[in-house]
Structures are given as structure tokens and as C-alpha cells.
């Protein structure tokens, strides 16, 4: 690995996290996330391997919670997979950033979607539960203490399984994104923040010690880490 990426750089701040960032650029970023996650998020494989069996087992009471849902694109993507499998699933996204919720509220959503300006610990205090709990690109934003707290919340909230997906830091991934992304994504924070996200992200051996007991870390191509908890309340 290049010395440049030999260690995480958790002190980097992403432009879209600035409360004073340009709103048009921010909204364009939310819109373009859908393309990014379709291309490299690997959520169809995650769904088939880790989510679908639990959702089928839950029958007509299946539900998915997305912690830190951003603009809601992951839930929209998963809804398509569930619909293809004739699964009735309730979708809930929580997001503490009011700007994301305002963006979401301007979009059209099916009746079985709910979005809340909330955090995971608030849902724990409300004693809520979901079949599967997920997050996407959340881990690298959190301090070790925050990560432990969100993992514990997710353990409580999930009846069947938790899957947290994030980038794995690598020179090849950084180089590929730096080369290709500027050709695809304009007038947004996707390129600049994507590169910063890679620099902030973990490698597999770095992430494992920061997760509570009962969690495991798996690699998934391209350049993904999945933190998975297979416990649950039922």
C-alpha cells in the first residue's frame, strides 16, 4: 500500500458535512448517490446473501431500518429488490441531518416508507424493532466511541441481522475513483468527498478491534467492508 494511504485520516472533514455548504451542490450529491451506490455499493449482493433470508423468515412483518439514510437512495434500491421477490417490507430511514430530511421530504415515496429526523439511540428509547438494520458509508464518519454506541443500538433494534457497509481504504480504490468519478459526477461533492471518505476509511484488520463482541468483518468487492451482527431478539 502507498505510504499516502497506509493509515486512516479520521480528522479529514467532508465538504457536505459543513452546515454552511452550498445547498444546490448538496442536493446534487444526494441525487448522485443513487448512481454511486448502484455502481459500487454492492447492495444487490448484500440483499441476496445477508438480507433476503431474514426478510422471508419474517413473513408479512418484515422491516428494514437504515441508520444515517442520507437522501434515502439505499432504501429505494432495496425496495426494488424486495418488490422483485414479492416481499412486503416496511422501510424506515433515520437521519440526524435536517438538510437530508428536507431533501427527502421533497421527493415522492411509497406509503410503506417512513423517514425520521432521528438518531438510533432515540429509537432504542422508544423500544422499536426491525427485521434488519443497515447503514451505508456511516462507519468512517464515527469516532470509536460513537461506532460502539451505534453498534449497540443496532443490536437492540434488529430482530434478525445488522449489516453496516462501508468503503475499505486502498490505493487501487483511491486511484480508480480519482480517475473515473470526475467523468461521471459533476457539480456535486461526490468526487472530493469520495476521495476524503476513502482516506478516512478502515481496512479490515483495523475495523475488527473497534466492533463489539459478536460482530464480524467481511470483504466484498469492489473495495467494501461489511460489519455484520447475526444475533437478534427472535
Q: Can you say where each PLM-predicted feature lies in the sequence?
A:
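Conserved beta-strand signature within the Rossmann-like core of class I S-adenosyl-L-methionine
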Residues: 159-167
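A conserved beta-strand element that flanks and buttresses the S-adenosyl-L-methionine
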Residues: 134
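N-terminal, positively charged/glycine-rich alpha-helical extensions of SAM-dependent methyltransferases
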Residues: 1-31
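C-terminal alpha-helical "lid/dimerization" subdomain adjacent to the S-adenosyl-L-methionine
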Residues: 167-210
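Class I SAM-dependent methyltransferase SAM/SAH-binding core
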Residues: 65, 71-74, 78-122
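A short, conserved alpha-helix within the catalytic core of class I
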Residues: 142-153
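Class I SAM-dependent methyltransferase Rossmann-like catalytic core
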Residues: 23-46, 54
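Conserved Class I S-adenosyl-L-methionine
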Residues: 200, 204-230
Amino acid at each position: 500500500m502507498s505510504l499516502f494511504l497506509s493509515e486512516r485520516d479520521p480528522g479529514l472533514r467532508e465538504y457536505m458535512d459543513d452546515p454552511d455548504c452550498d445547498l444546490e451542490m448538496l442536493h446534487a450529491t444526494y441525487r448522485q448517490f443513487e448512481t454511486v451506490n448502484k455502481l459500487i455499493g454492492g447492495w444487490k449482493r448484500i440483499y441476496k446473501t445477508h438480507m433476503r433470508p431474514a426478510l422471508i423468515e419474517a413473513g408479512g412483518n418484515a422491516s428494514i431500518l437504515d441508520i444515517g439514510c442520507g437522501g434515502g437512495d439505499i432504501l429505494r434500491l432495496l425496495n426494488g429488490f424486495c418488490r422483485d421477490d414479492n416481499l412486503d417490507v416496511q422501510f424506515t430511514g433515520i437521519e440526524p441531518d435536517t438538510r437530508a430530511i428536507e431533501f427527502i421530504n421533497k421527493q415522492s415515496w411509497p406509503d410503506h416508507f417512513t423517514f425520521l429526523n432521528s438518531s438510533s439511540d432515540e429509537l432504542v428509547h422508544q423500544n422499536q424493532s426491525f427485521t434488519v438494520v443497515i447503514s451505508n458509508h456511516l462507519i468512517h464518519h464515527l469516532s470509536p466511541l460513537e461506532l460502539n454506541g451505534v453498534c449497540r443500538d443496532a443490536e437492540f433494534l434488529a430482530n434478525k441481522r445488522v449489516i453496516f457497509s462501508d468503503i475499505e481504504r486502498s490505493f487501487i480504490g483511491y486511484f480508480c475513483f480519482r480517475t473515473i468519478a470526475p467523468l461521471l459526477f459533476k457539480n456535486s461533492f461526490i468526487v472530493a468527498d469520495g476521495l476524503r471518505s476513502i482516506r478516512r476509511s478502515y481496512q479490515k484488520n483495523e475495523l475488527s478491534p473497534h466492533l463489539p463482541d459478536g460482530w464480524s468483518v467481511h470483504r466484498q468487492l469492489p473495495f467494501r467492508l461489511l460489519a455484520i451482527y447475526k444475533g437478534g431478539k427472535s
